[in-house]
Every structure is written in structure tokens, then in C-alpha cells.
Curated annotation (Swiss-Prot):
GO terms for molecular function: structural constituent of ribosome. InterPro entries: Ribosomal_bL19, Ribosomal_bL19_CS, Ribosomal_bL19_sf, Translation_prot_SH3-like_sf. This protein is located at the 30S-50S ribosomal subunit interface and may play a role in the structure and function of the aminoacyl-tRNA binding site. Keywords: Ribonucleoprotein, Ribosomal protein. PROSITE patterns: RIBOSOMAL_L19. This is Large ribosomal subunit protein bL19. HAMAP family: Ribosomal_bL19. GO terms for biological process: translation. One of its GO terms (cellular component) is cytosolic large ribosomal subunit. It comes from Rickettsia massiliae (strain Mtu5). SUPFAM superfamilies: Translation proteins SH3-like domain (SSF50104).
Length: 138
């Protein structure tokens, strides 16, 4: 392993120590919580920073696995318009990633969804079996 790969692995492990990044792929519906920092200037001229969290929910149409620069593209429909946003997987701005639904698709990149609307843009849902535990058997 060369120095750059070692450096990337250190940064990825630092990022994943605080937040768990779930396994997801193209076709899955995810809810990404993003940290937003607002700057406002008070009357006395001082700058005030406020943090807030904003949720962005949509379908993952592309995923790019490239170490520390990994990213994924999420598409949602907002007020009748398609909105796409790319998130860096290991960015400190991304507070959490939650998988809402797992989808069944046959492609790695779902760019064809840009040209579709309504029923033709739907994705089948993949049902994941729940692990059997001792409590479930009893």
C-alpha cells in the first residue's frame, strides 16, 4: 500500500468512527441529513454562525466508489421539477445517511430516470428478510 492509499484509509476510518455509513446502491431510496452553517451579521457588526440540519430524500441514481472521494447522486422531485444533488460519502457536511427503501434495478447508473415521470419512473422494492432471532422463534 502506498502513502496516498494509507492516508485515504486513515481519513475514511476517522470519518466512519463517528457515523456509520450503510450499504446502499443505485435504485435505493435514501434520506441524507446535511449540516448547514448559516452566517448572519448582528447589529453590532459581529458575525454569528448557526448550525442546522436539513434532510434530503430521494432515489440514488449513481454511485461512485473512489476511496475518500466516493460520492453518490440523489434525485428527487420537488414541486414538479426534478432535482439532483451529489453528496460526497465521507464529507463532514453529511451528518447521516439512512436507507428508506431498497430498490430492484438492473443498471448501475439510472440516468434514464431523468426522462421519465410518474408511473414509468417507479422502482420496484426489494424486500430484505429479517434475521431470525431466538425471540422470533419463541
Amino acid at each position: 500500500m502506498n502513502i496516498i492509499d494509507h492516508f485515504e484509509q486513515e481519513n475514511i476510518s476517522k470519518r466512519t468512527a463517528n457515523t456509520k455509513i450503510p450499504e446502499f446502491e443505485a435504485g435505493d431510496t435514501v434520506k441524507v441529513t446535511v449540516k448547514i452553517i448559516d452566517r448572519s451579521i448582528e447589529k453590532d457588526g459581529k458575525e454569528k454562525l448557526t448550525e442546522r440540519f436539513q434532510a434530503y430524500e430521494g432515489v440514488v441514481i449513481a454511485k461512485r466508489n473512489r476511496g475518500i472521494t466516493s460520492s453518490f447522486l440523489v434525485r428527487k422531485i420537488s414541486h414538479g421539477e426534478g432535482v439532483e444533488r451529489r453528496f460526497m460519502t465521507y464529507s463532514p457536511i453529511v451528518h447521516s445517511i439512512d436507507v428508506v427503501k431498497y430498490g430492484v434495478v438492473r443498471r448501475a447508473k439510472l440516468y434514464y430516470l431523468r426522462n421519465r415521470s410518474g408511473k414509468s419512473a417507479r422502482i420496484k422494492e426489494r424486500h430484505i428478510p429479517i434475521a431470525k432471532t431466538k425471540a422470533a422463534k419463541a
